[in-house]
Every structure is written in structure tokens, then in C-alpha cells.
């Protein structure tokens, strides 16, 4: 027999509305009726950003798949891979610009060939050639590794990146901000405190960041929540975080996922995905305004439904996503502006295009134009 769960207590709602949700509140909300959780998150979304849903016309540029990391969730890295030349990077940026992009997201593995001078040259070349393109690049891990190779401090590296034209640092390499979890899934990566220190140093240097959480593997529910509360604490200190992107773990073609599936455990369910989006909106209310439902992880239909659960952004056109595809992602690598508009309007919302920093931009091309799904990806870069 179905037992109706009690309504959300008034004192919890009051704390949430004040931006003071506690961990105990969050656990209580997750134990309750999920549809009441979604409704609360949706109301907070409406009061914060209204009925506007944003997306960005962008392109991922994967500069290298070489990596000395030992992350157990990664199927992307190879010992013998490619490194794009400056010319290849600029060519891909030009293709993106011609397709109406306002952002390039530059990412890859970390490798001894890529010191800080390597990244500074890339950032400067892109900004010089395409000053109207936002450069969203490097992770806190890459900054730490490359700065170490070049014998400079993280703070100096960030100042140089800012001077060369970096607009935003990616909030990836966060995974789960728990050292217990990190020792299992990415033992060679920076610690939780190093990640926090790098992000706050970026904000002090005038560089915005987003934030991410990669969940659905070995972490506990409380560790997920602790992660989101850590993001809140950073934001209270610096105000430099533009968004949170919850990313569900893809368990295919990687050691962590294979071990999970062999034991009968799979990644997060659709309900868990929506609950995390909702509770993130609730915890971060009055602090981080933007919660993304990333279609490349959730699929287009679940991402659209997440707009009823606290999300207000659908991410980017991407044009390619080698990392998700390598780990079994099956939702494609490109969504056209026209399809984003259709998804958003179908949810009863108002679509807008934005840039990296969540500033509204006028479309550079009509939504019906630009790069179409028949787009042929360029070949990978030159072998080293």
C-alpha cells in the first residue's frame, strides 16, 4: 500500500528560501516525495531566473588525448596519442566562429609536452585571432600540472593566463570533492583542497569558473551533498562561479565502471539525476544562479524534463564530445541551435543564447542555420 510521505516542513522551506539550507535539510528533502522536491526546486528556479532557459553555441576543442593520469573513470587517455598544433586549433576555432559560436572550450589530458608556456601560446593565439570568442579552458588539474612543469606558482600561472586572454577556467577535475573518493577514482589528481585553492585563486585573478560534480560511482549520498556545499562555500567567499553542472558517470570502457558492472551496480538512475539537479538548486539558492542539465550525459528528453526540476540551462552545441563518447555516451556530440530552441519552447520556456559568463548574446546566425547534424568532424591532430 502506498504511504504518502509528509509535506516539506515550513522551517525547512524558510531556510531554503533564505539560502541557508543545511545538510540535514537536504537529506530530509531527498527522503521525501521527489515531486515535492522538484516543485520546490522549480519554484526557486522561477524566482531566480524566471522562465528563461539558456544555451551556448560553442565548440569543444580537444588539444590532446595524451595523459599521464591514472583516473579509473577515463576511457579517453592514451599513451600514444595526438597533440594539436596551433594551426589546427585556430582552424577549429575559425570553423566554430563561422558556425555562430561565441565560445570555445579547450581541454585535454595533462602530459609533459604541455607546460604552461604551451597553454599560454594557445590562449594568446586564439584571443589574437578571434577576440570576440570567449575562451573557456583548462581545469584546475591542468593548471597545477602545467605550472609545476614550468616552475611557476599556480597564482602566477593564472595571472599569465588572464593576461593572455583566458576568459573562464573550467570547473572540471572536481569529480567528487572528497579525498576518500579521489584516492579511489583519481589517485594522481590534485586533492580537494588544491582544487578549492586553485578555483579561489582564479577568482582572485579575475578569472571566472564554472563548477562540476561527476557522480554515480563510488561516492556516498552524503559525499555528493558535501561536494555541493563546498561549491556554496567557495561562492560565498568569491562569487566567481557561474554555474554548476551535474554530470552522471558513464561506466563503459573504464576500470571503475567495469568493476561496478561486474558487481551488479550501474550508474545513477534517471530519478537520481533529477534529484541531484533539484537539490543542487535548493542548496545553492541565492548563491549560484545557474544549474545546467547537460544533454550529452542525460539525453535530450531527460535534460528537457530537468527544466521542471530546477535546471535553467541546457549547455552547449559542443560539436564534438570525445570524452563522453569514449566512455559509452550515446546521446551524440552535437545539438543545433534550432533543436535547442525546440526543446526549450516545448518545455514552456523562453530560449536565449548566452556566452560563457551567462551574458545574453544576440545569435550570430539564425537558429535554423549554422552547423548541421551532418557536420563531419575534423581528423585528430598530428601524431607526436
From Swiss-Prot:
[4Fe-4S] cluster binds at residues 67, 71, 74. Gene3D superfamilies: Aldolase class I (3.20.20.70). Pathway: Cofactor biosynthesis; coenzyme F0 biosynthesis. One of its GO terms (molecular function) is metalloendopeptidase activity. SMART domains: Elp3. It holds the Pfam family Radical_SAM. Keywords: 4Fe-4S, Iron, Iron-sulfur, Metal-binding, S-adenosyl-L-methionine, Transferase. The keyword Amino-acid biosynthesis does not apply. CDD domains: Radical_SAM (cd01335). It comes from the Archaea. SUPFAM superfamilies: Radical SAM enzymes (SSF102114). The keyword RNA-binding does not apply. It catalyses: 5-amino-6-(D-ribitylamino)uracil + L-tyrosine + S-adenosyl-L-methionine = 5-amino-5-(4-hydroxybenzyl)-6-(D-ribitylimino)-5,6-dihydrouracil + 2-iminoacetate + 5'-deoxyadenosine + L-methionine + H(+). Its cofactor is [4Fe-4S] cluster. Its EC number is 2.5.1.147. Binds 1 [4Fe-4S] cluster. The cluster is coordinated with 3 cysteines and an exchangeable S-adenosyl-L-methionine. Consists of two subunits, CofG and CofH. Belongs to the radical SAM superfamily. CofH family. HAMAP family: FO_synth_sub2. Catalyzes the radical-mediated synthesis of 5-amino-5-(4-hydroxybenzyl)-6-(D-ribitylimino)-5,6-dihydrouracil from 5-amino-6-(D-ribitylamino)uracil and L-tyrosine. This is 5-amino-6-(D-ribitylamino)uracil--L-tyrosine 4-hydroxyphenyl transferase 2. It comes from Methanosarcina acetivorans (strain ATCC 35395 / DSM 2834 / JCM 12185 / C2A). The lineage of its organism: Archaea, Methanobacteriati, Methanobacteriota, Stenosarchaea group, Methanomicrobia. The gene is cofH2.
Amino acid at each position: 500500500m502506498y504511504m504518502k510521505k509528509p509535506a516539506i516542513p515550513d522551517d525547512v522551506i524558510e531556510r531554503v528560501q533564505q539560502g541557508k539550507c543545511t545538510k540535514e535539510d537536504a537529506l530530509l528533502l531527498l527522503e521525501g516525495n521527489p515531486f515535492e522536491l522538484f516543485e520546490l526546486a522549480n519554484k526557486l528556479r522561477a524566482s531566480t531566473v524566471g522562465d528563461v532557459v539558456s544555451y551556448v553555441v560553442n565548440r569543444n576543442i580537444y588539444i590532446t588525448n595524451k595523459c599521464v593520469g591514472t583516473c579509473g573513470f577515463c576511457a579517453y587517455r592514451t599513451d600514444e596519442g595526438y597533440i594539436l598544433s596551433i594551426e589546427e586549433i585556430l582552424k577549429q576555432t575559425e570553423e566554430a566562429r563561422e558556425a555562430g559560436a561565441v565560445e570555445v572550450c579547450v581541454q585535454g589530458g595533462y602530459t609533459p609536452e604541455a607546460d604552461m608556456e604551451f597553454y599560454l601560446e594557445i590562449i594568446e593565439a586564439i584571443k589574437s585571432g578571434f577576440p570576440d570568442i570567449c575562451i573557456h579552458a583548462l581545469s584546475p588539474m591542468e593548471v597545477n600540472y602545467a605550472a609545476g612543469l614550468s616552475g611557476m606558482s599556480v597564482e602566477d600561472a593564472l595571472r599569465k593566463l588572464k593576461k593572455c586572454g583566458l576568459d573562464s577556467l573550467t570547473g572540471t577535475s572536481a569529480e567528487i570533492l572528497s579525498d576518500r573518493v579521489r584516492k579511489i577514482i583519481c589517485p594522481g589528481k590534485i586533492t580537494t583542497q588544491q582544487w578549492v585553492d586553485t578555483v579561489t585563486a582564479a577568482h582572485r585573478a579575475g578569472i571566472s569558473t564554472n563548477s562540476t560534480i561527476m557522480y554515480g560511482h563510488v561516492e556516498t549520498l552524503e559525499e555528493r551533498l558535501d561536494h555541493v556545499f563546498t561549491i556554496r562555500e567557495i561562492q560565498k567567499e568569491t562569487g566567481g562561479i557561474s554555474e554548476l553542472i551535474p554530470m552522471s558517470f558513464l561506466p563503459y570502457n573504464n576500470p571503475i565502471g567495469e568493476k561496478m558492472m561486474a558487481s551488479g551496480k550501474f550508474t545513477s538512475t534517471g530519478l537520481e539525476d533529477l534529484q541531484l539537479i533539484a537539490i543542487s538548486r535548493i542548496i545553492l539558492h541565492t548563491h549560484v544562479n545557474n544549474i545546467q542539465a547537460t544533454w550529452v550525459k542525460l539525453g535530450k528528453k531527460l535534460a528537457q524534463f530537468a527544466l521542471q526540476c530546477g535546471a535553467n540551462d541546457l549547455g552547449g552545441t559542443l560539436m564534438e564530445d570525445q570524452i563522453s563518447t569514449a566512455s559509452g555516451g550515446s546521446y551524440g556530440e552535437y545539438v543545433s541551435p534550432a533543436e535547442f530552441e525546440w526543446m526549450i519552447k516545448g518545455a514552456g520556456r523562453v530560449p536565449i543564447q548566452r556566452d560563457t559568463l551567462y551574458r545574453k548574446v544576440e545569435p550570430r546566425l539564425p537558429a535554423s542555420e549554422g552547423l548541421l547534424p551532418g557536420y563531419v568532424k575534423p581528423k585528430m591532430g598530428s601524431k607526436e
